Amino acid sequence: YNFSFYDNHDVLIWDLMKNKIKIDYVFNLCDEGFNNEARKELHVPALLEMLKIHYSGSGPQCLAYCYDKSLVRGIAKEMDIPVADGIYIKQEDMSFTFLPFNFPVLVKPNFGDSSFGITQKSVVKDMEELISVISELRSEFGYEYPLLIEEFLIGADISVGIIGNPPESYKVLPIIEEDYSELPKDLPKICGYEAKWLPTSPYWKIKSIPLNLPEETNNFIIESCLKLFRRLECRDYCRFDWRLDSNNNPKLLEVNPNPGWCWDGHLVKMAKLEGISYSNIIEEILKATENRIGLFQNNI
């Protein structure tokens, strides 16, 4: 492959327009959003759509769906795919005095990715802590958008990766779980902001390991991921996060159609378990894109 890197967002639109005739397709590595604004993650594929340039990965509508966690929850429930019990809290809402499910609960931003706003403090055990954490998200993190409050699940913390485009041609990568065995026992078992971005945190010791599930549970999770992949219009690759409850029942947490590209990201970890290197996983995604757009069949 011969690549040209377009990483200057100030002139990105002009560069794409100027060089459009030379571009077979774009490998979209922009997982932090246009101008590094997370809410503008969908703007890059939207721009490519308007310029009629083919690109890898999901389209703007899919990215918009999945950026809204409550919307994904609603779609999953409509499809009879279980999700954690939860409620949606609007920006101005601090008047609630009870929850329709038991503590402990997990508080997280409804919009966003990269575990922004999800820390050890996000797992709370009573109403007083809950109100305090919500206030902190509003003030210290500057998060002014709706929140989700979900039951805190204590079972295996699971990730599933798919490369390709079901139902025609796809690969389900080995399922992994987070290994919390080295985490101090007084800390909640979550893979949040500290685990991904703070090397000095005890959460940095979390590892991802292969997960062996009962066949029925394994098949249900994979089938549900494939259904969601198609329903949400994911393309070429995607990651799905699940967690088991205390009875080992799987519950969908989130769908990430544009997971991070760092060398130690979850998609890369899954691929390594199947002997797929970092460069090979990129090649497989490129091949999935080429097959989808008919690059060679139609001489595009």
Pin down the residues of each PLM region:
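Conserved N-proximal alpha/beta basic substrate-recognition cap immediately N-terminal to
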Residues: 1-85
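Active-site nucleotide/adenylate-binding loops and adjacent lid/helix of ATP-dependent enzymes
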Residues: 17-20, 63-148, 154-156, 166-167
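Peripheral (often C-terminal) accessory segments that flank ATP-dependent C-N-forming ligase machineries
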Residues: 95, 203-216, 231-237, 244-247, ...
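Phosphate-binding site of ATP-dependent enzymes
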Residues: 127-216, 220-223, 246-251
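Conserved metal-phosphate-binding beta-hairpin within the catalytic cores
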Residues: 151, 160-162, 229-262, 271
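A short, polar/charged loop-to-alpha-helix boundary motif
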Residues: 184-185, 262-270
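Short, flexible active-site recognition loops that position polar ligands and cofactors
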Residues: 267-279
